Amino acid sequence: MIGIIGAMEEEVTILKRKLNDMNEINIAHVKFYVGKLNHKEVVLTQSGIGKVNASISTTLLIEKFNPEVVINTGSAGALDQTLSIGDILVSNHVLYHDANATAFGYEYGQIPQMPKTYTTDPTLLKKTMHVLEQQQLNGKVGMIVSGDSFIGSSEQRQKIKQQFPEAMAVEMEATAIAQTCYQFKVPFIVTRAVSDLANGKADISFEEFLDKAALSSSETVSLLVESL
């Protein structure tokens, strides 16, 4: 079983339409769609936006369906200036940009008693990049950071880049999903597509290009599932 998580309806609709023999299960106001994608058994869920929603949905997914791997799909705001709308992002590790327990000796972005970063499963990363290369898609590997704020101003963007110069993108769920997978010892990967440039026009760009980003990310996930 392969678990797939997207936060918003737009981020899961394309994959949902591709499911064969689909069965819908509702648990604690979270919808799970069980079926086959490219002849592989999958469970797809729309987690809702933000870290708590993402963690709840991931916990339910793992406890109820026991997936072998978890894939997080969706959109993200670009922090790397070389990225363009629709580009594919693949995590090598993820962390929180809004966690601060430095007063107790932890690094910025680190939750107390937890790792600073959560590392993508190397086998999943290798397979994802192989899929992108085969399809000649523009994919980039790097750090993705998460927090409970939509980054819609240049000031917010700059603050994150000051703390995490290597961060290539920002969104609101991936690290919570990764932390949950870490605690349950389930391999994970994050593959998202750029919907906005995390600047003063991010809100307009996000609304305009969300569907494009969702399509790019969904196609990547579909191809990855086929390769697993």
Swiss-Prot record:
<feature type="binding site">
    <location>
        <position position="77"/>
    </location>
    <ligand>
        <name>substrate</name>
    </ligand>
</feature>
<keyword id="KW-0378">Hydrolase</keyword>
<protein>
    <recommendedName>
        <fullName>5'-methylthioadenosine/S-adenosylhomocysteine nucleosidase</fullName>
        <ecNumber>3.2.2.9</ecNumber>
    </recommendedName>
</protein>
<dbReference type="GO" id="GO:0019284">
    <property type="term" value="P:L-methionine salvage from S-adenosylmethionine"/>
</dbReference>
<dbReference type="GO" id="GO:0019509">
    <property type="term" value="P:L-methionine salvage from methylthioadenosine"/>
</dbReference>
<dbReference type="GO" id="GO:0008930">
    <property type="term" value="F:methylthioadenosine nucleosidase activity"/>
</dbReference>
<dbReference type="InterPro" id="IPR035994">
    <property type="entry name" value="Nucleoside_phosphorylase_sf"/>
</dbReference>
<keyword id="KW-0028">Amino-acid biosynthesis</keyword>
<dbReference type="GO" id="GO:0008782">
    <property type="term" value="F:adenosylhomocysteine nucleosidase activity"/>
</dbReference>
<comment type="function">
    <text>Catalyzes the irreversible cleavage of the glycosidic bond in both 5'-methylthioadenosine (MTA) and S-adenosylhomocysteine (SAH/AdoHcy) to adenine and the corresponding thioribose, 5'-methylthioribose and S-ribosylhomocysteine, respectively. Also cleaves 5'-deoxyadenosine, a toxic by-product of radical S-adenosylmethionine (SAM) enzymes, into 5-deoxyribose and adenine.</text>
</comment>
<dbReference type="InterPro" id="IPR010049">
    <property type="entry name" value="MTA_SAH_Nsdase"/>
</dbReference>
<feature type="binding site">
    <location>
        <position position="151"/>
    </location>
    <ligand>
        <name>substrate</name>
    </ligand>
</feature>
<dbReference type="GO" id="GO:0005829">
    <property type="term" value="C:cytosol"/>
</dbReference>
<feature type="active site" description="Proton acceptor">
    <location>
        <position position="11"/>
    </location>
</feature>
<feature type="binding site">
    <location>
        <begin position="172"/>
        <end position="173"/>
    </location>
    <ligand>
        <name>substrate</name>
    </ligand>
</feature>
<comment type="pathway">
    <text>Amino-acid biosynthesis; L-methionine biosynthesis via salvage pathway; S-methyl-5-thio-alpha-D-ribose 1-phosphate from S-methyl-5'-thioadenosine (hydrolase route): step 1/2.</text>
</comment>
<dbReference type="InterPro" id="IPR000845">
    <property type="entry name" value="Nucleoside_phosphorylase_d"/>
</dbReference>
<feature type="active site" description="Proton donor">
    <location>
        <position position="196"/>
    </location>
</feature>
<dbReference type="Pfam" id="PF01048">
    <property type="entry name" value="PNP_UDP_1"/>
</dbReference>
<dbReference type="GO" id="GO:0009164">
    <property type="term" value="P:nucleoside catabolic process"/>
</dbReference>
<comment type="similarity">
    <text>Belongs to the PNP/UDP phosphorylase family. MtnN subfamily.</text>
</comment>
<keyword id="KW-0486">Methionine biosynthesis</keyword>
